[in-house]
Amino acid sequence: MALIVQKFGGTSVGTVERIEQVAEKVKKFRDGGDDIVVVVSAMSGETNRLIDLAKQISEQPVPRELDVMVSTGEQVTIALLAMALIKRGVPAVSYTGNQVRILTDSAHTKARILQIDAQRIQRDIKAGRVVVVAGFQGVDEKGNITTLGRGGSDTTGVALAAALKADECQIYTDVDGVYTTDPRVVAKAQRLDKITFEEMLEMASLGSKVLQIRAVEFAGKYSVPLRVLHSFQEGPGTLITLDEEESMEQPIISGIAFNRDEAKLTIRGVPDTPGVAFKILGPISAANVEVDMIVQNVAHDNTTDFTFTVHRNDYNNALQVLQGIAAEMGAREAIGDTNIAKVSIVGVGMRSHAGVASRMFEALAKENINIQMISTSEIKVSVVIEEKYLELAVRALHTAFELDAPAGNTAE
């Protein structure tokens, strides 16, 4: 008998029919002898519908009141799922984040979980009940309802698994696991049986949408075994593990991640003096713009060109700030480019194998793809390229690192 926390997202509970299917799946696990805690999101599209309603009142809704409003979406889903389970003869009870005391800070719309009081859930489990908990929400010390931001239900699931010391946290999605890359781009992408937390964290931060980065961070911090599974198909999914040895038989590179949400900014001809990076990035940070990759080139005339990347939706704001900085510092110009993308190779095998980066660069060179920026870590190499070459680059790297599935075994 195992204690399993199962999390189902909005698509998985998007209709009453799908909620009935989820109830069947939960019943199957319980009939097998497992204790089950279920975390669910609001039905697909419901959170957006509620936000749109709020914006009909105010373009910038008060965050506290917005949290009160959008948290109702999950309340509907938990009650429906509990009803579906009870109809099947499975004792079940539903709880909001407040009712199980998921304590968060007071950062409305983007709160972070501080503590969970697991006693109430443990009593229900002991009494033989399936506990259905609303994801995405909690309560602060003053009793105010809070929400965790987009993807917060994943974090709720992992946090509950940690608090309950569950044997596994299962994240159910519309894919049957973590793939070597997006199967929509590379038909020969393969599902990974196992991947390390480090690799998953890198892939999540680099644009992989399978798991939210906060959930992966939480799982790694509290050593919660994570498994990604398809909501309505049978299969082993992908186990995310702390043990690198379990991944030793995998290739050097576990996956190719990519992100189109990139923009590049450059300030040219800046006087090369101490503190130049802070003078540029300080105001950018103050404008709440997150900087990703950075490259600095020093010229012979004691000036420097400073280039960095940001999220594409921050581009206009960042360029406006950078133009002001250029005028203040006497730089030649501030320019930008939104026609870029980032491609990354990820794998713990890089630690013990030389020449991985050069192999990546060679594969791109063979396709005449120019590299504009490079960033590396122990288990990752990222490059910025022209966006129109993105899919070509991903396919070339997938083949170069021998990640293609054998003939007749491609992703569907």
Swiss-Prot record:
Q: Name one GO molecular function term.
A: ATP binding
Q: In this protein, which residues make up the domain named ACT?
A: 265-332
Question: Transmembrane segments in this chain: where?
Answer: none
Q: Which GO terms describe its biological process?
A: diaminopimelate biosynthetic process; homoserine biosynthetic process; lysine biosynthetic process via diaminopimelate; methionine biosynthetic process; threonine biosynthetic process
Q: Give one Pfam family, short name only.
A: ACT
CC annotations in GO: cytosol
The record's keywords, sorted A to Z, are: Allosteric enzyme, Amino-acid biosynthesis, ATP-binding, Cytoplasm, Diaminopimelate biosynthesis, Kinase, Lysine biosynthesis, Methionine biosynthesis, Nucleotide-binding, Threonine biosynthesis, Transferase
Give the catalytic activity.
Answer: L-aspartate + ATP = 4-phospho-L-aspartate + ADP
Q: Signal peptide position in this chain?
A: none
Q: What is the regulation of this protein's activity?
A: Allosterically and strongly feedback inhibited by tryptophan. Addition of lysine alone slightly enhances activity. The simultaneous addition of lysine and tryptophan leads to very strong feedback inhibition of the enzyme. The feedback control by tryptophan is reduced in the presence of the compatible solutes hydroxyectoine or ectoine.
The catalytic activity of this protein is classed by the Enzyme Commission as 2.7.2.4
Copy the pathway line from the protein's UniProt record.
Answer: Amino-acid biosynthesis; L-lysine biosynthesis via DAP pathway; (S)-tetrahydrodipicolinate from L-aspartate: step 1/4; Amino-acid biosynthesis; L-methionine biosynthesis via de novo pathway; L-homoserine from L-aspartate: step 1/3; Amino-acid biosynthesis; L-threonine biosynthesis; L-threonine from L-aspartate: step 1/5
Which NCBIfam families does the UniProt record give? asp_kin_monofn, asp_kinases, PRK06635.1-2, PRK06635.1-4
Family classification:
Belongs to the aspartokinase family.
Q: What is this protein called?
A: Aspartate kinase Ask_LysC
Q: Which organism is it from?
A: Stutzerimonas stutzeri (strain A1501)
Q: Encoded by which gene?
A: lysC
